Amino acid sequence: MTTTLQQRESVSLWEQFCQWVTSTNNRIYVGWFGTLMIPTLLTATTCFIIAFIAAPPVDIDGIREPVAGSLLYGNNIVSGAVVPSSNAIGLHFYPIWEAASLDEWLYNGGPYQLVIFHFLIGIFCYMGRQWELSYRLGMRPWICVAYSAPVSAATAVFLIYPIGQGSFSDGMPLGISGTFNFMFVFQAEHNILMHPFHMLGVAGVFGGSLFSAMHGSLVTSSLVRETTEIESQNYGYKFGQEEETYNIVAAHGYFGRLIFQYASFNNSRALHFFLGAWPVIGIWFTAMGVSTMAFNLNGFNFNQSILDSQGRVIGTWADVLNRAGIGMEVMHERNAHNFPLDLASAEPVSAPVING
């Protein structure tokens, strides 16, 4: 009997780390993008939670009128927000070391920049990590392509729009009511409801919801029965089974008769590509719309009302939007300027006569 002793190959600590980072056997895949994603998202989340709970008021308009957004300063979950950095800061990069003190940094809304920059880097890395894991597993790269839609939307409202408007104070506040306020002001200043790219985005989101519900209900209604009537149909599926779990021919026949033949897919791969592509392309268009409106390439304006033969205004939906936009613009930053640009006029306008 012969015993052979072989010297074990020594692996450096760096090589062990590389193998661990790129291993697909880990419970959660880390990846090289993950080494940057994890600290940035943890930093953004931690700062957001602390600022949402305890941040002092922020001078968002740069006119020495601070706006409180945290829970400890009188807000609730709905009204609370991380308030954007001050208009006095503009587009300047404003880390903690750029301020004279921590109090000054908080007063000028420094936490907002800290959160959004780390958040954006984190979601960019998350998208890269999706590609990286797909590559390691030999999969196609479409998962990260689909994820690029919400990434582009977040980049548009947190980075591109403030750059176009000249100040991070115009970025979207990090809160529920702050998001709604951002939407109202965006409509008032850019007429986004009349922008074709926004319309395509609405079609993408609502259409995607409709198609998802239609697909799920069709599949659920055409499952191949593998159980008795007293058992859940979910028990009829075994993870990894080779057999089809639903009858696509039956679903195709039902939907083709419900509408017409060519409205129904007879190819499962083409169907699922369509379900993925429709909302993604719609959200891409919305992000492009916000990015173009950031530089004031706004939605359609129908400022000239339709008049009848006597000169009376015939009200249209465009008139409703214009009037609502002016009203919202008047209420926005009401102490930062006297009148919105839409109301500024070289000629004096007499007040309307009130019929008493």
Swiss-Prot record:
Pfam families xrefs: Photo_RC (PF00124)
A single GO cellular-component term on record: plasma membrane-derived thylakoid membrane
Residue positions binding pheophytin a: Y126
Transmembrane segments annotated in the record for this chain: 29-46, 118-133, 142-156, 197-218, 274-288
One of the GO biological process terms: photosynthetic electron transport in photosystem II
Primary location class: membrane
Compartments it resides in: Cellular thylakoid membrane
Propeptide, residue positions: 345-356
InterPro entries per the UniProt record, alphabetical: D1/D2 (IPR055266), Photo_II_D1/D2_sf (IPR036854), Photo_RC_L/M (IPR000484), Photo_RC_L/M_CS (IPR055265), PSII_D1 (IPR005867)
Modifications after synthesis and translation: Tyr-161 forms a radical intermediate that is referred to as redox-active TyrZ, YZ or Y-Z. C-terminally processed by CtpA; processing is essential to allow assembly of the oxygen-evolving complex and thus photosynthetic growth.
Highest taxon listed in the record's lineage: Bacteria
Annotated PROSITE patterns: REACTION_CENTER
Binding site for a quinone: H215, S264, F265
Family note: Belongs to the reaction center PufL/M/PsbA/D family.
Annotated protein name in UniProt: Photosystem II protein D1
Native source organism of the sequence: Crocosphaera subtropica (strain ATCC 51142 / BH68) (Cyanothece sp. (strain ATCC 51142))
Organism lineage: Bacteria, Bacillati, Cyanobacteriota, Cyanophyceae, Oscillatoriophycideae
